Curated annotation (Swiss-Prot):
Subunit structure: Homopentamer. Pentraxin (or pentaxin) have a discoid arrangement of 5 non-covalently bound subunits.
Gene for this chain: APCS
Keywords: Amyloid, Calcium, Disulfide bond, Glycoprotein, Lectin, Metal-binding, Secreted, Signal
Cysteine-cysteine disulfides: C55-C114
Binding site for Ca(2+) 2: E155, D157, Q167
The organism of origin for this protein: Sus scrofa (Pig)
Illness association: SAP is a precursor of amyloid component P which is found in basement membrane and associated with amyloid deposits.
GO BP annotation list: host-mediated suppression of symbiont invasion; innate immune response; negative regulation by host of viral glycoprotein metabolic process; negative regulation of monocyte differentiation
Subcellular location: Secreted
Binding-site list for Ca(2+) 1: D77, N78, E155, Q156, D157
Domain of life: Eukaryota
Protein name: Serum amyloid P-component
Location of the Pentraxin (PTX) domain: 24-224
One function term, GO molecular function aspect: carbohydrate binding
Entry cofactors: Ca(2+)
């Protein structure tokens, strides 16, 4: 009987730490700098990516650098990484190679980010609040590997670990979607506006599988 009660207690605690939920109107809040607090995003990605688009909203008052989206493979870090180095400067890493995008920003202010990459041309796009930045090119012909470990709140230096609190994210993240294709400019603007857009094939904020670790809280999004 005691063992049964223990399992009931464990199962009762799972919905918040490990869940499949519609998070519409919600955000993950990372309230402090740490080397532990993070969210794992769970996806069954079994084939390498030739193309992708990733979109999300973020709000932070950090002026130092921090990771926004970290996608690692077993034995390969920075396979796909979105990193903000400083105010107005973002980088996209593909297979440890990076390109940097610069934008004039009002700080602190919520931001909507979309970034895409296609293997055939190597062209990477970066959109801030529905507006495109100058296109860059990297890793033409490369394939982003399958079976990733995807983390929000920390930058991975190993597969699901190797965190450094000086690169941790402090703030709020929401409305995260990922496709295995390059969205058109019109589609990216629809995502930014929160209107009807193509169904996400990799990560879907409205049906998200995730695991929260450490001090991470889900709260309503009160900013736009």
């Amino acid at each position: 009987m005691e063992r049964l009660l223990l399992w009931v207690s464990v199962l009762a605690s799972l919905p918040e730490a490990f869940a499949h939920r519609d998070l519409t109107g919600k955000v993950f809040v990372f309230p402090r700098e740490s080397a532990t607090d993070h969210v794992k995003l769970i996806t069954k990605l079994e084939k390498p990516l030739q193309n992708f688009t990733l979109c999300f909203r973020a709000y932070s008052d950090l002026s130092r650098g921090y990771s926004l989206f970290s996608y690692n493979l077993q034995g390969k870090d920075n396979e796909l990484l979105v990193f903000k180095h400083r105010i107005g400067e973002y980088s996209l890493y593909i297979g440890k190679t990076k390109v940097t995008f610069k934008v004039r920003e009002v700080f602190p202010r919520p931001v909507h980010i979309c970034t895409s990459w296609e293997s055939s041309t190597g062209i990477a796009e970066f959109w801030i609040n529905g507006e495109p930045l100058v296109k860059k090119g990297l890793r033409q012909g490369y394939s982003v590997g399958a079976y990733p470990r995807i983390v929000l709140g920390q930058e991975q230096d190993s597969y699901g670990g190797g965190f450094d609190k000086t690169q941790s994210f402090v703030g709020e993240i929401g409305d995260l979607y990922m496709w295995g294709s390059v969205l058109s400019p019109n589609e990216i603007r629809l995502v930014y506006q929160g209107l009807s857009f193509p169904h996400p094939t990799i990560l879907d904020w409205q049906a998200l599988n995730y695991e929260m670790n450490g001090y991470v809280v889900i709260k309503p999004r009160v900013w736009s």
